[in-house]
C-alpha cells in the first residue's frame, strides 16, 4: 500500500525529491485544514448552497515539499505547508506539522526534533555536493560509499571529482 494523498485544493501541490524512501500507509494532506479561528469547524460552504460563496474553508497552508534522500516512516502523516529538508528522517507514525531541517530526525505526534544525522559541517558539505543531482552512472559508481559510514572518504572520492 503506497502513500495516500488527500487534496482539497487544486492549487496545492505535493513535490517529492529524488531517491526518497517512502514507507507504507503514509498520508499527505494537501489542504483540508479546518479553520480553528471560525465559530464552527464544519465545512458548511462545501456542503450547502447557502455557504457556497464563502471561501477559505477548508484551507491550506501551502505545498508539501519533500527534499531529496528523505526517509518517511510507516503510517506518517504530513500536513500542508510543510517542507522536509534533504536527507531528513521522519519516524514511523509521526504527524509532521512544521518544517523539518535538512538531515534532521523527527518523530512523534506532533513530530519533534530528535537529533541531526551528522554534524553541521557534514550537512553543509552534503547539501553543497547534492549527490542526488549527479548523473546516474556516477551515482552507481558511488554506491559502495553511499551505502557506508565512510563520510570523509565519500567527500574525497573520484566520483565526487567527476561531478
Where would I find each of the regions flagged by the language model?
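Flexible, glycine/small-residue-enriched loop-and-beta-strand segment within the central core
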Residues: 1-80
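Conserved catalytic-core motifs of eukaryotic protein kinase domains, centered on the activation segment
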Residues: 32-33, 100, 116-117
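C-terminal segments of enzyme domains that contribute to small-molecule binding surfaces
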Residues: 44-78, 110-163
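Extended beta-solenoid/beta-helix repeat architectures
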Residues: 83-84, 100
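Conserved acidic donor-binding loop of glycosyltransferase catalytic domains
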Residues: 91, 97-98, 114
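Acidic, glycine-centered active-site loop in nucleotide-sugar glycosyltransferases
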Residues: 102, 107-110
